[in-house]
Amino acid sequence: MLYRSALRASRSFTPRLASTNSRLVSSLVFLEHKAGKLNEASLSAVTAAKTLGNDTHGLLVGTKSEIENVLDRTKEIKDLSKIYLATSDTYSHSLAEPLASLLASIASAKDVSHIFAAHTAVGKNIFPRLAGLLDTSLIADIIALESSGDTFTRPIYAGNAVLTIKSSPKDSVKVVTVRSTAFDKAAVANGSAAVEDVDIITVDTPTQFVSEELTVSSRPDLASAARVVSGGRALKSKESFDTILDPLADSLGAAVGASRAAVDAGYADNSLQVGQTGKVVAPELYVAIGISGAIQHLAGMKESKMIIAINKDPDAPIFQVADVGLVADLFESVPQLVKEIDNVKV
């Protein structure tokens, strides 16, 4: 594996933070939520933050009704000692500019040493801006960190190498996104976090919310599902993708995923893509159907606890990481597998 350390050069500009005589003693976790539910990936970010041994605080933002829907459960998170609330319509759609300014303000006012978020679409949108406002490095997609708080590990080259990063002492606030599959979820039980309101920060921004289209599915969320069934280009068409994968996913209670080749061919929506440029998953069970196993796809699923691969090519790279491999025609074997599963369930 490749290891490399990097120290940033000193800067001529110092961000407006708490007094240099103040002791930076707490970590802050940005807690995502949507439609009245806390994003499970944020619980992994809490676990990462707790590694440092500091007081760990959470931040909930949104309208009054949005916060009320998730506050009770959030207070139950065992590893949080305090929850900051920023209640305003300004934060109702998670626009990056106002949220980055809010986080920067809290970092200055609350003696924060580290700010964490899950490495999700929301985190990846907000945290680069936050790092810019604080004139600090963004440390993205970490899979480990040391209790010292200045050394982090992240994958590079599609997961084929690991980079060790030592942040500069000039970065008095560390801005970090966390790969959720690399950390256990913080327990949501017996917590007793205190609640504190924070000031709303108003910023002028050219970005305005226009609309949002959400895909409604009865299946588990792909990023956090315990079981995932993914299909590749070998399914040959969108119709086959749906008719072959959906029954198996329904039988297993699984989420549906897709390789980049299947997405590019129009078989599946981009939101289902698993891989280096898609979602990174680590379910208990991952079933790869008609997926050859390109390195970009493996980067998004190789940490799965159990991998089952079905492919008619015995030399397909996917078999090198699979725990169970079946060399067979997917159009025959998958329907038969569904029948067997349903028979067992009966």
UniProtKB/Swiss-Prot annotation:
Disulfide bonding pattern of the chain: none
Residue numbers binding FAD: 285-313
GO CC term (a single one): mitochondrial matrix
GO molecular function terms listed in the Swiss-Prot or TrEMBL record: electron transfer activity; flavin adenine dinucleotide binding
InterPro entries: DHS-like_NAD/FAD-binding_dom, ETF_a/b_N, ETF_a/FixB, ETF_alpha_N, ETF_asu_C, ETF_asu_C_CS, Rossmann-like_a/b/a_fold
Co-factor requirement: FAD
Keywords from the UniProt entry: Electron transport, FAD, Flavoprotein, Mitochondrion, Transit peptide, Transport
Annotated compartments: Mitochondrion matrix
Cofactor binding description: Binds 1 FAD per dimer.
GO terms of biological process kind: fatty acid beta-oxidation using acyl-CoA dehydrogenase
Effect noted on mutating residue 107 to V: In strain: JEC20
Broad class of where this protein is predominantly found: mitochondrion
Pfam families with a match to the protein in the record: ETF (PF01012), ETF_alpha (PF00766)
Recorded family membership: Belongs to the ETF alpha-subunit/FixB family.
Entry function: The electron transfer flavoprotein serves as a specific electron acceptor for several dehydrogenases, including five acyl-CoA dehydrogenases, glutaryl-CoA and sarcosine dehydrogenase. It transfers the electrons to the main mitochondrial respiratory chain via ETF-ubiquinone oxidoreductase (ETF dehydrogenase).
Subunit structure: Heterodimer of an alpha and a beta subunit.
Protein name: Probable electron transfer flavoprotein subunit alpha, mitochondrial
